[in-house]
Amino acid sequence: MVEFAPLFMPWERRLQTLAVLQFVFSFLALAEICTVGFIALLFTRFWLLTVLYAAWWYLDRDKPRQGGRHIQAIRCWTIWKYMKDYFPISLVKTAELDPSRNYIAGFHPHGVLAVGAFANLCTESTGFSSIFPGIRPHLMMLTLWFRAPFFRDYIMSAGLVTSEKESAAHILNRKGGGNLLGIIVGGAQEALDARPGSFTLLLRNRKGFVRLALTHGAPLVPIFSFGENDLFDQIPNSSGSWLRYIQNRLQKIMGISLPLFHGRGVFQYSFGLIPYRRPITTVVGKPIEVQKTLHPSEEEVNQLHQRYIKELCNLFEAHKLKFNIPADQHLEFC
């Protein structure tokens, strides 16, 4: 039975839905449309635009791995405020961040579309710059997406950078500090476990971000986004199932995961690709001090990794009851 939305709704709520629809469209289809449009322009009287952009693209080819190109006006678009209010999304600070230092922030969980990570670190809708004055956030994204013309410039303007060591080093070595490099540690593969009530994190063997922190002496900041996994339902794909096998194979081949998810639609609540209206609260933990070690041993990496997991668990346990998570529910790692 399809549950339709009321015919008469406040314009505020309609604008919120439109803002989220724009985000989902951008996440799922904008890169592909930009690529097709770029090629199609070659066969029109506007072919010169493609040539000029290609020249610009070549000259600017290293920018995504050199800190990107923050454009504050785009980060402050009103549409992001409507998107934030749709769920709503809020950002909680538990400790200060020193603006004279550079940080690595581990963001958990990925969720299906990484809504919390984008809203908090790539827009000013939740007031990141006011909550953490002097800190400029960046968020790592698969290098693949920066190969899409026009789309690359759009995502760079929000603070997204490539997920390469060179990209991380450029940000973490900036003199004067004031940079936070966000890494969604579980990555695209973790999206396959994103469903309501799931607290499984892909972290047990993810140690690259820890090695980065040791190499650059950057404090580690654990971040947990409560409600991230509640935004969509997902077709059952338990470990060992044929669907999960296919998804894992495609993820290894293409570098992106393909969760079969569904939420609600624009005019009805029963099915569609728009996330449910469920609150997201992103809690930023206290920094973990890291001693700079240019060539860390496996033991040093493992020790810091275990400490990070412990601090992340402490952060989750300290706040879970506020979000009606059962007392006997704990984070699970794979």
UniProtKB/Swiss-Prot annotation:
The keyword Phosphoprotein does not apply. One of its GO terms (cellular component) is endoplasmic reticulum membrane. This is 2-acylglycerol O-acyltransferase 2. CDD domains: LPLAT_MGAT-like (cd07987). Its EC number is 2.3.1.20, 2.3.1.22. Pathway: Glycerolipid metabolism; triacylglycerol biosynthesis. It is an enzyme of class 2 (transferase). Its main location: endoplasmic reticulum. It is found in: Endoplasmic reticulum membrane; Cytoplasm, Perinuclear region. Highly expressed in liver, small intestine, colon, stomach and kidney. It comes from the Eukaryota. It catalyses: a 2-acylglycerol + an acyl-CoA = a 1,2-diacylglycerol + CoA; 2-(9Z-octadecenoyl)-glycerol + butanoyl-CoA = 1-butanoyl-2-(9Z-octadecenoyl)-glycerol + CoA; 2-(9Z-octadecenoyl)-glycerol + octanoyl-CoA = 1-octanoyl-2-(9Z-octadecenoyl)-glycerol + CoA; 2-(9Z-octadecenoyl)-glycerol + dodecanoyl-CoA = 1-dodecanoyl-2-(9Z-octadecenoyl)-glycerol + CoA. Keywords: Acyltransferase, Cytoplasm, Endoplasmic reticulum, Glycerol metabolism, Lipid biosynthesis, Lipid metabolism, Membrane, Transferase, Transmembrane, Transmembrane helix. InterPro entries: DAGAT (IPR007130). Belongs to the diacylglycerol acyltransferase family. The chain crosses the membrane at residues 23-37, 38-59, 103-123. Coiled coil: none annotated. One of its GO terms (biological process) is triglyceride biosynthetic process. The lineage of its organism: Eukaryota, Metazoa, Chordata, Craniata, Vertebrata. Inhibited by oleic acid and sphingosine, while it is stimulated by phosphatidylcholine, phosphatidylserine and phosphatidic acid. Disulfide bonds: none annotated. Involved in glycerolipid synthesis and lipid metabolism. Catalyzes the formation of diacylglycerol, the precursor of triacylglycerol, by transferring the acyl chain of a fatty acyl-CoA to a monoacylglycerol. Plays a central role in absorption of dietary fat in the small intestine by catalyzing the resynthesis of triacylglycerol in enterocytes. Has a preference toward monoacylglycerols containing unsaturated fatty acids in an order of C18:3 > C18:2 > C18:1 > C18:0 at sn-2. It is a multi-pass membrane protein. The keyword Oxidoreductase does not apply. GO terms for molecular function: 2-acylglycerol O-acyltransferase activity; acetyltransferase activity; diacylglycerol O-acyltransferase activity.
